């Protein structure tokens, strides 16, 4: 951010996106910023992203429920309801909550924050590799929610058999990571 001018970057127009661990990173970064956490102290006062796009992401809130001390930037969440690698709902690691997109969206909806959530019914972690598959949804989110600043809230479940399954997901063994099914 300190080199934004020399790089020709508008710091007010930065949108971050990630899938799986990258989605966890971008969602956690936004949570840290909105809650004034120590990790966000390296950023300029008042900085926030213009938007966040997450494909199979979650956060570690560490204390209590999912709360945002200030309104988060517009968020687009995509997650498979049967994800066993990054939880769609929530799990606990050593008394630390790992809250997925379904839990995050409840807070966003309850507070009336600017977000879109696309739940892929029955899909698993392959949603982490669907950035190209969701291109039209991404472009609409970027144009309407981010660039125009419109509060377009979408929270929907999709039954999409056309979601491509990457080679690493075809065997199904990855689904047994922390569940017995």
Describe these PLM feature segments:
Residues 1-71:
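Primarily recognizes the serine-hydrolase "nucleophile elbow" in alpha/beta-hydrolase
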Residues 7, 19-21, 84, 100-107, ...:
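Gram-negative outer-membrane beta-barrel domains
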Residues 14, 75, 114-115:
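Hydrophobic anchor at the start of a short beta-strand
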Residues 24-28, 48, 100-103, 133, ...:
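Extracytoplasmic/secreted proteins, especially bacterial periplasmic and envelope-associated proteins
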Residues 32-34, 69-71, 92-97, 136:
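Glycine-rich, phosphate-binding/catalytic loops in enzymes
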Residues 77-79, 83:
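Short beta-strand/loop motif that positions the catalytic acidic residue
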Residues 84-100, 127-131:
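Conserved alpha/beta-hydrolase "acid-adjacent" motif
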Residues 109-181:
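C-terminal catalytic histidine-bearing segment of alpha/beta-hydrolase fold enzymes
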């Amino acid at each position: 951010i300190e080199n934004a001018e020399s790089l020709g970057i508008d710091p007010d127009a930065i949108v971050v996106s990630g899938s799986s661990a990258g989605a966890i990173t971008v969602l956690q970064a936004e949570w840290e910023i909105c809650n004034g956490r120590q990790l966000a102290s390296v950023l300029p006062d008042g900085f926030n992203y213009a938007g966040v796009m997450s494909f199979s992401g979650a956060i570690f809130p560490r204390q209590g429920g999912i709360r945002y001390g200030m309104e988060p930037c517009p968020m687009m969440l995509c997650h498979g309801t049967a994800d066993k690698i990054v939880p769609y709902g929530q799990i606990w690691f050593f008394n630390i909550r790992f809250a997925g997109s379904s839990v995050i969206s409840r807070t966003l909806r309850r507070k009336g924050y600017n977000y879109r959530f696309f739940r892929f019914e029955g899909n698993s972690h392959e949603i982490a590799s669907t950035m190209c598959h969701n291109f039209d949804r991404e472009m609409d989110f970027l144009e309407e929610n981010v660039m125009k600043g419109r509060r377009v809230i979408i929270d929907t479940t999709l039954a999409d058999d056309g979601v491509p399954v990457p080679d690493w997901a075809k065997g199904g063994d990855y689904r047994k990571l922390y569940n017995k099914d």
